[in-house]
């Protein structure tokens, strides 16, 4: 647990806490500990310390090479703006140089950007009769159009309490790109049905 940046310590205090505590956490739990945060103000200091002390950072909470990495490693992406493969290449070089090779990742294309583009395309194709509503293969083709090289997967939301799938809500994910290694191929893995019954 860490201080809330909206509390009296502010953003600076919350960031300082992460900078100071991460080395102790790595020492206590080991370098094979995966760190994660949902507080955007704490992402940059966490990335810095994870790289410096050799721990693992799978991906940001809103996965994107723009989420925390440029600020944490002083990366200027002015020339690469709008070019996701070039952005990933430059961020990857900085992460590897900082010591995060094979231990830090992200989605190669911003979650927000790619989902906005894909859903607009999906709606367009449905109206044109080129895609069917609730057809995941058609949806993945729309994601693929805007995210070459990245794989996508997902499934309709399953309400465990009611025991039903809700086809109107699809949980999607892009394969994680690990800097210095490439894609994890996590989207190739099938989630066993038995996990739909865990309460």
Where are these regions (language model features)?
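A residue-level marker of the well-folded mature domains of exported/periplasmic proteins
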Residues: 1-199
């Amino acid at each position: 647990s860490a201080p809330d940046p909206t509390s009296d310590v502010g953003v600076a205090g919350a960031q300082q806490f992460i900078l100071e505590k991460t080395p102790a956490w790595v020492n206590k739990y080991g370098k094979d500990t995966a760190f994660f945060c949902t507080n955007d103000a704490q992402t940059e200091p966490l990335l810095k310390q994870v790289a410096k002390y050799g721990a693992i950072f799978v991906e940001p909470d809103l996965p994107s090479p723009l989420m925390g990495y440029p600020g944490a490693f002083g990366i200027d992406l002015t020339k690469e703006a709008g070019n996701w493969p070039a952005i990933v290449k430059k961020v990857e070089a900085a992460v590897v140089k900082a010591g995060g090779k094979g231990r830090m990742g992200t989605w190669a294309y911003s979650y927000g950007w790619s989902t906005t583009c894909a859903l607009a395309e999906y709606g367009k194709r449905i109206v044109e009769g080129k895609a069917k509503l609730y057809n995941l293969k058609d949806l993945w083709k729309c994601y693929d159009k805007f995210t070459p090289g990245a794989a996508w997967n997902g499934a309709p939301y399953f309400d465990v309490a009611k025991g039903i799938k809700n086809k109107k809500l699809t949980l999607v994910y892009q394969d994680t790109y690990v800097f210095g290694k490439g894609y994890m191929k996590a989207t190739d893995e099938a989630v066993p049905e038995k996990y739909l019954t865990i309460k």
